[in-house]
Amino acid sequence: MSKVRIYTLAKDLGVDNAKMLEILDGLGVAYKSVSSTIEEDTVELIKQILEEEGHTASAEPAPAQASGSPASPAQTEAQEAPQPTATATAEREPAAPPARELPHRAPVVTIMGHVDHGKTSLLDYIRKTKVAAKEAGGITQHVGAFEAKTSKGKIVFIDTPGHEAFTTIRARGANVADIAVIVIAADDSLMPQTREAIAHAQAAKVPMIVAINKVDLPQADPEKVKTDLTQLNLVPEEYGGDLIVVPVSAKTGEGVEDLLEYISLTAELEDLRADPQGEFSGVIIESRVDRQAGVLATVMVQEGTLHVGDFLVVGENYGKVKAMTDSNGGRIKEAGPSTPVQVLGFSEAPSSGEKVVSVKNEHAARELVAQRVETRREAENARVQRKKTLEEMMGPLGETRTVNLILRADTQGSLEAIQGILARKETEDVKLNVMLAGIGSPTEGDVLLASTADATILCFNVTASGSVKKAAEQRDIELKSFRIIYELIDEVDRLIKGNVEPVFEERPLGRAEVRMVIRHPKSGNIAGSYVTDGLLRRNAKARVLRGKQVVYEGTIVGLKRFKDDVREVQAGYECGVNLDWNDVQEGDIIEASELVEVAQA
């Protein structure tokens, strides 16, 4: 019995992929994605359902929207469903007017992978074949991104292949790419930078598509690549997983159309939308200083529309858009979502990954920049780093915590031994997530990944260079090197212990009898007391007993011996106790206690 891919059937029947998945869900048919295959009898059932709904199957694909974006299920059904009769309309409850749906936007794609696996060659082939000849001939400057026109619409490619650029942008809190294409050479399979690229894409939580390049070579072995991917828990669809794997050749063009088709399908499922009428916001892709023109910055528009004449603020820098150039080198007056543009107008070159916003005028731009400068100066002067609360560091209480790790070792054997130990160290409360494990010294790319994923870098028998250590210090990343395996294990134990929900018990410190109440104009009532047992300590927990009843629970905010502030007072001495509570009375008993963390096995 023949099988057919879901997206192929949707295309042949002229329906939206989302509609097709909706029907399959109703039939209880299992699938991984729109590229999964279904049986012929299921195809017949789908056709019957569509006919009952009044849809006429078409041998030709449904026409693409003018914008090139995939239609939403609601739009598709509105176009395909028969018009209701007056009787049917009268029987329905009056529906509230639907909220304005945001239009779809083009996907933004980044290409990553190991050096020499063909990232740039693949981009060059796509640019050569998917950018109109007259436009391609007009490209005079590199703007960091380009638009490819396909049968499914526009796809934007970030033209700076490599995970370093991708993660540099993410490290500043910006997400630009919607989809990551991991390029792997069919004759080389997984290499260190391949694993790094995969780790970066996973940390960014963007959908991944694997392009197995160089399949035209005689020594190409795509099956080995697929098998190797399963070792990273990335299972190709044909093996029963959900990873899309596409064999391609950047040299001959084989499979490139399929790759673009899969990118469009993934984007459709992600349902990417943006409001061109909203407030403008974007991200700096790259910037440079041109000797003649001045500062040129490539901006990826994410929301709203950017116009010539707009005032922009990025970091502590602002400027007015004097001119804009699209990815084909042409002058434009405005740019909507998912459009990369080169902007002329900044006085200083902004950094990759910085967020860009628009303001009404120059006065507003100056005010916003001044506010940001003041905020930074206050932070610098105070030299205070905001300490994370226990819940921020460890997640909500009662949930499993995840400790992200990056491992570097001198040999593959050492790596495997360490990973085996880590697997045995996991507990119900703490999960150890090795984001990246590689042979050799840590890199600045590791530090970038650690900064975006809040990871710790552990090195065994390898040392970090001065520049990597400096980068780790600047980003406040824990980077530790070990020569003895047991020391590394001790560090892992420390990390686990630091992520286990602490258990505290209350232990008594001492008791005091209130013998007189002293009225103080600033501090309120002070309890003149005599310590009968143990000791009282400043900042200790306190409760006040009046007879057998507890009348107050709080903290000892201050202790005095005569006129001196003291930290604690032992039994047999008098003192003044400030409870920040004015109802204390003679004869009350103050009991002090402290919370002590209980050691856990």
UniProtKB/Swiss-Prot annotation:
Region (G1): 113-120
Molecular function terms, GO-annotated: GTP binding; GTPase activity; translation initiation factor activity
Low complexity compositional bias, start-end: 57-89
Domain tr-type G: 104-273
UniProt-annotated stretches for the region G2: 138-142
Any one annotated GO CC term: cytosol
Domain of life from the UniProt record: Bacteria
Family according to the record: Belongs to the TRAFAC class translation factor GTPase superfamily. Classic translation factor GTPase family. IF-2 subfamily.
Protein name per UniProt: Translation initiation factor IF-2
Species lineage: Bacteria, Thermotogati, Deinococcota, Deinococci, Deinococcales
